């Protein structure tokens, strides 16, 4: 079918566009319509009145668009003016009632979002959130403006002519309102933004680093609990008034022994960095309340932590800033700053001497590893070698080696001493002021002749065969264990227990003992002695089995035994009668009305007893010790230098 010439459609519409069918010369064998002239020229005169411009629809659309935009701009200006006026009288906390859809301040209409259809929507309440110069957000209720949308032209000319001007005018209105209602550079706004931040501590740490050029954590160590007490504290206080900051430097002195105060002006006000040593220990809560009262700053604007006491970098910072003109320092410099900054202290702390630690443990009679570790660590403030010990990564090894060496030295020292020297050595460790009479009175109270007891004690201390064991028996609560244990405590004797008799090593403590004791021997225990330990009771050499060591041949030390039965009178153990020296305690131990012992038996009284009966017990000095009255046994020393102390 041949193509028809002309246009399709009626050509109506507001856009002014129409379609023109091109006239194409005949190139095929198709038949041409008879009512058309193939040779006629198309001049377009028949289309001159095709579009009617009298309605002027485009001009009307542009005029309506301008009126709508003007109305929107005026409504926005009025709303902004109302918010600026009401912000002074509206609660900054806002209303908690539910609202409609929130409209952002940057949400503006453009020509591209406008359609020709006009539709009215139900008026709803909207909330405009306006920043309030750091004092919180103001929420102002207003009626939502009737939505009017206008369709855009397909060529986008309206957007180019009017859309840009609308956005520029709206943005200019917003900037003017912001400049009037909020100054982001003001100190008040900055400190309020700090308080409103989600992570206040991170914000304060960031501002501190920007101000001082170093991290706050480089100067402090962290206390997880707010109740932990400490005398030294580092405080960073934000937003302090300049006048209060100057007066604070004087007011704080009466609460502290040492203060180091730095104050710098920032956008948030004065930022104070302070190192303070209080007169007594305080926790974080107490320190915060005190500083808040003096500076009129909330505790949430403070960073409070104790200083690093072992960091040379932190100590050097306080030392260098303390001698500069940016700090106000009062009081004596803390010892931990002096220790970490003085050159000599630094040299001494860097070298650890194990022999010094061993000498300290030997002099103070520490042989347990836990006691050595704890007590030596307590000396770190006044002993450079102890401070170096704490800095070492081999503390456990040093403690173990120190305890081992101290035990070796103690064991060798004890073996080289005779019984007279050992008693003299133990007397030198006790204080004066004892009385020997309570011991004698207690023996008489139990019906024991003092002279017979002295004779038995003399043979007992010498380790005479068949006289090497003393047995004290009697009813319960007669003071047997109290009397014997006090003597063991004074002479540092060793206590063995029959409960461990199933082990081959239960007698191993006898290897290092000058004196031994077995408390509360029963019939089973006496049977064991009768079967296996007759030579030990005689005071002859015995063989001891030691754990992880070879058998040791040694003379059994003097043995003191308490019991509720008399082994001499029992027919089951006839062979023990000649090996035991027996004393009976028949009377109950006396107490006064306050439940205190009537006869006081302690180290002081035993010292006085041995000094009084020294000659009676035949505790004479050795010939190689000299003719003087004092026993000059030189104190052991394992470090260089002179030691003038005597034993």
UniProtKB/Swiss-Prot annotation:
It catalyses: Couples ATP hydrolysis with the unwinding of duplex DNA by translocating in the 3'-5' direction; ATP + H2O = ADP + phosphate + H(+). It comes from the Viruses. The keyword Hydrolase applies. Residues 159-170 have a biased composition (Basic and acidic residues). There is a cross-link at residue 555 (Glycyl lysine isopeptide (Lys-Gly) (interchain with G-Cter in SUMO)). InterPro entries: Helicase_SF3_DNA-vir (IPR014015), P-loop_NTPase (IPR027417), PPV_DNA_helicase_E1_C (IPR001177), PPV_DNA_helicase_E1_N (IPR014000), PPV_E1_DBD (IPR046832), PPV_E1_DBD_sf (IPR046935), Rep_E1_papillomaV (IPR016393), Znf_lg_T-Ag_D1_dom_sf (IPR037102). The modification Phosphoserine is found at residue 92. Residues 183-349 are annotated as: DNA-binding region. ATP binds at residues 474-481. One of its GO terms (biological process) is DNA replication. Phosphorylated. Sumoylated. One of its GO terms (molecular function) is DNA binding. Keywords: ATP-binding, DNA replication, DNA-binding, Early protein, Helicase, Host nucleus, Hydrolase, Isomerase, Isopeptide bond, Nucleotide-binding, Phosphoprotein, Ubl conjugation. Can form hexamers. Interacts with E2 protein; this interaction increases E1 DNA binding specificity. Interacts with host DNA polymerase subunit POLA2. Interacts with host single stranded DNA-binding protein RPA1. Interacts with host TOP1; this interaction stimulates the enzymatic activity of TOP1. ATP-dependent DNA 3'-5' helicase required for initiation of viral DNA replication. It forms a complex with the viral E2 protein. The E1-E2 complex binds to the replication origin which contains binding sites for both proteins. During the initial step, a dimer of E1 interacts with a dimer of protein E2 leading to a complex that binds the viral origin of replication with high specificity. Then, a second dimer of E1 displaces the E2 dimer in an ATP-dependent manner to form the E1 tetramer. This is Replication protein E1. It comes from Human papillomavirus 39.
């Amino acid at each position: 079918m041949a193509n028809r010439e002309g246009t399709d459609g009626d050509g109506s519409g507001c856009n002014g566009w129409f379609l023109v069918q091109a006239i194409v010369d005949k190139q095929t064998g198709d038949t041409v319509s008879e009512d058309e002239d193939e040779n006629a020229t198309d001049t377009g005169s028949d289309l001159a009145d095709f579009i009617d411009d009298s309605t002027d629809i485009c001009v009307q659309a542009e005029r309506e668009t301008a009126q709508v935009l003007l109305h929107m701009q005026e409504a926005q200006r009025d709303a902004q003016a109302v918010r600026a006026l009401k912000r002074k009288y509206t609660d900054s906390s806002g209303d908690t009632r539910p609202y409609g859809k929130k409209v952002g301040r940057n949400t503006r209409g453009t020509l591209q979002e406008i359609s020709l259809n006009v539709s009215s929507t139900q008026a709803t309440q909207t909330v405009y959130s306006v920043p309030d110069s750091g004092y919180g957000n103001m929420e102002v209720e207003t009626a939502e403006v009737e939505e009017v949308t206008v369709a855009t032209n397909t060529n986008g000319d309206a957007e180019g002519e009017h859309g840009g001007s609308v956005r520029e005018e709206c943005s200019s209105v917003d900037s003017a309102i912001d400049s009037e209602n909020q100054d982001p550079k003001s100190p008040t706004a900055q400190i309020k933004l700090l308080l409103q931040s989600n992570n206040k501590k991170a914000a304060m740490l960031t501002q501190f680093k920007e101000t001082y050029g170093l991290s706050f954590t480089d100067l402090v160590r962290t206390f997880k609990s707010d109740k932990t007490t400490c005398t030294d504290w580092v405080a960073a206080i934000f937003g302090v008034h300049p006048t209060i900051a100057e007066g604070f430097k004087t007011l704080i002195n009466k609460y502290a022994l040492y203060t180091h105060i730095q104050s710098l002006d920032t956008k948030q006000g004065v930022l104070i960095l302070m190192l303070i040593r209080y007169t007594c220990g305080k926790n974080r809560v107490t320190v915060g309340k005190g500083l808040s009262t003096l500076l009129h700053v909330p505790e949430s604007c403070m960073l409070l932590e104790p200083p690093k006491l072992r960091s040379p970098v932190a100590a050097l910072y306080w030392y260098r800033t303390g001698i500069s003109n940016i700090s106000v320092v009062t009081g004596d410099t803390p010892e931990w700053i002096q220790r970490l900054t003085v050159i000599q202290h630094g040299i001494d702390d860097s070298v650890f001497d194990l022999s010094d630690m061993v000498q300290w443990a030997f002099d103070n009679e520490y042989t347990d590893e836990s006691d050595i570790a704890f007590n030596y660590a307590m000396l770190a403030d006044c002993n450079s070698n102890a401070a170096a010990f704490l800095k070492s990564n081999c503390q456990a090894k040093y403690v173990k080696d120190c305890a081992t060496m101290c035990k070796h030295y103690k064991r060798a020292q004890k073996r080289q001493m005779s019984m007279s020297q050992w008693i003299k050595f133990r007397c030198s460790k006790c204080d004066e002021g004892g009385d020997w009479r309570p011991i004698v009175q207690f023996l008489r109270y139990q019906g024991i002749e003092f002279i017979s007891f002295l004779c038995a004690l003399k043979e007992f201390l010498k380790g005479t065969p068949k006289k090497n064991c003393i047995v004290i028996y009697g009813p319960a609560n007669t003071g047997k264990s109290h009397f014997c244990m006090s003597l063991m405590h004074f002479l540092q004797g060793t206590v063995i227990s029959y409960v461990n008799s199933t082990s081959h090593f239960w007698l191993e403590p006898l290897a290092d003992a000058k004196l031994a004791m077995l408390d509360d021997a029963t019939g089973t225990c006496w049977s064991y002695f009768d079967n296996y330990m007759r030579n030990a009771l005689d005071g002859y050499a015995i063989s001891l089995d030691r754990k992880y060591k070879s058998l040791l041949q040694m003379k059994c030390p003097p043995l003191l035994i308490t019991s509720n039965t008399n082994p001499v009178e029992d027919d089951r153990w006839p062979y023990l009668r000649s090996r035991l020296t027996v004393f009976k305690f028949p009377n109950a131990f006396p107490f006064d009305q306050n439940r205190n012992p009537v006869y006081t038996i302690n180290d002081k009284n035993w010292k006085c007893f041995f000094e009084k009966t020294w000659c009676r017990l035949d505790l004479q000095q050795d010939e190689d010790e000299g003719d003087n009255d004092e026993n000059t046994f030189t104190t052991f020393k394992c470090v260089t230098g002179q030691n003038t102390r005597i034993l």
